[in-house]
């Protein structure tokens, strides 16, 4: 499943996305937890989630259940 998250300059939503990924146990494959421009991979017990950020937007892709959990956490603040 793929989902658009926010505009690239929506830093509040980007922060909520990173918090949700951490809360769900995601391990970032990169050297930095920041979401700079590019493709970022996060590993979870239930699979891998990718986050793509460019100059215009941020989106995620991964297993349906995992993407749904992330969307729930960033949209209304519901915690696991």
Q: PLM features: residue spans?
A:
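Negatively charged, low-complexity tracts enriched in Asp/Glu with abundant Ser/Thr
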Residues: 1-33
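A generic structural signal for beta-strand entry/edge sites
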Residues: 2, 37-39, 55-59
């Amino acid at each position: 499943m793929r989902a658009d998250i926010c505009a690239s300059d929506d830093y509040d939503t980007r922060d909520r996305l990173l918090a949700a990924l951490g809360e769900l146990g995601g391990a970032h494959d990169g050297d930095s937890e920041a979401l700079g421009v590019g493709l970022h991979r996060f590993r979870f017990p239930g699979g891998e989630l990718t986050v793509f950020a460019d100059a215009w937007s941020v989106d995620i892709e991964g297993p349906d259940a995992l993407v749904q959990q992330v969307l729930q956490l960033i949209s209304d603040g519901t915690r696991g």
